[in-house]
């Protein structure tokens, strides 16, 4: 339970609020990632939700600070310091932003025991639960003596993950980070990374009546796609991770040629390669280039993202992980194989 703010734009009162009530208030406050809306759109940005939680945090006795990420966008940091000298830090890390939705989806509604609305799962539900838990610990007697608990409500998860990257760049470290992504209420200790790639084939244009005078870049790319979706995907399936299964490759975009009566001189595909713990973007590039050479295929390969998402894995034998498993009655950690 925590101080409530019953209407958007109002100030916290001394009433009490359950996690479900808090989630309703968070859903009512749109926080759509600005990347998905025109500049100045009223639903764009995380500030309204962050300001609301900051006011609640102060009322709950938490230390409130912000870490600027971009103009008008900042991570909200709510800290509960220990009563003694801090020996470890636990980081709670949900995100504030959502993708866009129809206006009615920002009005929460309860159906068959479930609360629906934009961000209810991803991740305003965990944000509400984590906030309420932290507020309860702040009121508890005794409070943690050696553990600092920080709720880092992050911006920009849905686009470029600038919020989490800014947290790391600012030197933040934790002994355990609990990410607010939905997991089906399972303790998850591993998830895949993502590397986006561009492959281009070049040919020579010619008239469609004399294709033998040209070199068809689309045909060349067709062989590359067949290789990636065939032999390469099979090789990835042969080396699965125990929690995540195999790495994957998906050709999600293709473009080439100008019109049917011209032999195309250029073709491009864009590929999503999901990586496993231990794999790196540079290693993926080397692997695909070697595969192309082996099959005598020519294609220009470049990364699409300057900062790919790395795979993550936490030691399943870490004492804090074991405590989580015990509380949940879960025999072993799971992996987010759906990402």
Regions found by a protein language model. Name each.
Residues 16-118, 139-145:
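Acidic/His- and Gly-rich active-site-bordering loop/insert found
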């Amino acid at each position: 339970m925590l101080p409530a703010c019953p209407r958007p734009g109002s100030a916290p009162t001394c009433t009490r609020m359950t996690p479900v009530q808090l989630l309703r208030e968070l859903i009512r406050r749109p926080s759509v990632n600005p990347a998905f809306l025109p500049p100045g759109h009223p639903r764009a940005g995380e500030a309204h939700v962050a300001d609301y939680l900051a006011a609640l945090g102060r009322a709950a006795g938490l230390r409130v600070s912000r870490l600027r990420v971009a103009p008008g966008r900042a991570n909200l940091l709510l800290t509960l310091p220990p009563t003694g000298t801090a020996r470890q830090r636990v980081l709670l890390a949900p995100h504030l932003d959502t993708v866009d939705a129809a206006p009615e989806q920002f009005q929460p509604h309860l159906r068959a025991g479930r609360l629906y609305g934009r961000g209810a799962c991803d991740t305003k539900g965990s944000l509400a639960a984590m906030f309420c838990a932290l507020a309860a610990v702040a009121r508890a007697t005794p409070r943690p003596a050696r553990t600092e608990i920080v709720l880092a409500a992050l911006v920009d998860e849905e686009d470029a993950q600038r919020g989490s990257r800014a947290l790391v760049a600012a030197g933040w470290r934790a002994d355990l980070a609990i990410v607010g992504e939905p997991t089906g209420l399972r303790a998850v200790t591993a998830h895949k990374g993502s590397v986006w790639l561009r492959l281009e084939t070049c040919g020579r244009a010619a008239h469609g009546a004399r294709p033998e005078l040209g070199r068809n870049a689309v045909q060349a790319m067709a062989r590359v796609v067949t290789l990636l979706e065939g032999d390469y995907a099979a090789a990835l399936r042969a080396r699965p991770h125990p929690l995540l299964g195999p790495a994957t490759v998906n050709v999600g975009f293709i473009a080439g040629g100008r019109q049917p009566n011209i032999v195309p001189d250029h073709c491009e595909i864009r590929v999503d390669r999901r990586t496993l713990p231990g794999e790196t973007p540079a290693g993926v590039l080397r692997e695909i280039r070697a595969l192309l050479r082996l099959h005598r295929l020519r294609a220009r390969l470049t990364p699409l993202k300057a900062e790919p998402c790395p795979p993550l894995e936490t030691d399943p034998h870490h004492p804090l992980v074991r405590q989580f498993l015990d509380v949940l009655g879960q025999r072993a950690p799971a992996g987010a194989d759906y990402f």
